[in-house]
């Protein structure tokens, strides 16, 4: 009895109605601790019912409900609101479909942003609301200076171009190598041959020059010779043989082996200025443009493997080719690209 009085005095029965489970809960099972005492169900004020219990079913008969406050027919104002809401909904759905079609790339299905069924509803709702706001702002304040969105393809043409540009790159330098097939005394060559330089602390080769053809050779002690400065393949071969004959006259058993063209450099002018910034942005996979370090754009073509130095004035330098045909092919492939980025 003391416990019942304690509950009646200090506890509010309405609080228990929301916070405590009913007396039939597992807390009052025989397995509960001994210091927990069940409430007396005989007292109506101490019988609790939990709001977590069975949910009452809503009545299906609405005949007793007062619906007199609802109008029988729509007024003219309500009709106008309904028509306006339908128009706004149709406009938003049309803008959303138009926005989805613009984001979907025509050539690459599945790439880019699109509102597909796999995206979450939250993402779709955010994107749709953002699109509606942006379309509303753009319709209110149109921008006449906005540039059209153009699909940019960063692919170098691999197929030969049928139309000829009419520009032929001119060879400026041909680098070749040869093997004299014997060991050489570089000090002896430097002391007895004309037009030579030799500083072993600076460079471990003899630098020799001849006037015809006007070239320079690097002669190493292993017998390797590098000839540079020739304007054609034939001039490079002739110059390499002349260097071998000079060394042979100094008493070395020289033989001329393994002549090979290692690099060819050519240049030309397309006669129009080029927008290097946009070209570098479009063909970023193949080009490198750092105007603070070098004023030209470095374009590395895949096929043929030729490096082009493109300047804003329209001058083009081609290097890295080992045959003359590679230079012509690389320039003919590059010329249509340069025309598309001509400054107007």
From Swiss-Prot:
Bias kind Low complexity: ranges: 110-120
Residue spans of biased composition, Polar residues class: 134-143
Subcellular location: Cytoplasm; Nucleus
Alphabetized Pfam families for the sequence: TBP
Entry keywords, A to Z: Cytoplasm, Developmental protein, DNA-binding, Nucleus, Transcription, Transcription regulation
GO biological process: one example: DNA-templated transcription initiation
GO molecular function ontology, one term from the record: DNA binding
InterPro entries: TBP, TBP_CS, TBP_dom_sf, TBP_eukaryotic
Stored Gene3D superfamilies: TATA-Binding Protein (3.30.310.10)
SUBUNIT field: Interacts with TAF3.
Family statement: Belongs to the TBP family.
Protein name: TATA box-binding protein-like 2
Species this chain originates from: Rattus norvegicus (Rat)
């Amino acid at each position: 009895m003391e416990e019942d009085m304690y509950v009646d005095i200090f506890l509010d029965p309405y609080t228990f109605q929301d916070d405590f489970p009913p007396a039939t809960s597992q807390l009052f099972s025989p397995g509960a601790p001994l210091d927990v005492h069940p409430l007396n169900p005989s007292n109506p004020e101490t019988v609790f019912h939990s709001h977590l219990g069975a949910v009452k079913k809503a009545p299906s008969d609405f005949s007793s409900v007062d619906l007199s406050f609802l109008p029988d027919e729509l007024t003219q104002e309500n009709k106008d609101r309904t028509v306006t809401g339908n128009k706004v909904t149709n406009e938003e759905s049309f803008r959303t479909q138009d926005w989805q079609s613009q984001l979907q790339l025509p050539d690459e299905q599945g790439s880019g942003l699109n509102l597909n069924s796999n995206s979450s509803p939250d993402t779709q709702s955010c994107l749709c609301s953002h699109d509606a706001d942006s379309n509303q702002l753009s319709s209110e304040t149109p921008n006449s200076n906005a540039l059209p969105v153009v699909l940019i393809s960063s692919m170098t043409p691999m197929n030969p171009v049928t139309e000829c540009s009419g520009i032929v790159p001119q060879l400026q330098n041909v680098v070749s190598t040869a093997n004299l097939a014997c060991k050489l005394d570089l000090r002896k060559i430097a002391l007895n041959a004309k037009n030579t330089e030799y500083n072993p602390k600076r460079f471990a080769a003899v630098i020799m020059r001849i006037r015809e053809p006007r070239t320079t050779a690097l002669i190493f002690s292993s017998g390797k010779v590098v000839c540079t400065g020739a304007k054609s393949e034939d001039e490079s071969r002739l110059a390499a043989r002349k260097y071998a004959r000079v060394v042979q006259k100094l008493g070395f058993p020289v033989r001329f082996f393994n002549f090979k063209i290692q690099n060819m450099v050519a240049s030309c002018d397309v006669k129009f200025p080029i927008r290097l910034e946009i070209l570098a942005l479009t063909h970023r996979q193949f080009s490198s443009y750092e105007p603070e370090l070098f004023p030209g754009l470095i374009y590395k073509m895949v096929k043929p493997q030729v490096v082009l130095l493109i300047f804003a004035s329209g001058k083009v330098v081609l290097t890295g080719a080992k045959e003359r045909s590679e230079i012509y092919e690389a320039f003919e492939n590059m010329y249509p690209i340069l025309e598309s980025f001509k400054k107007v």
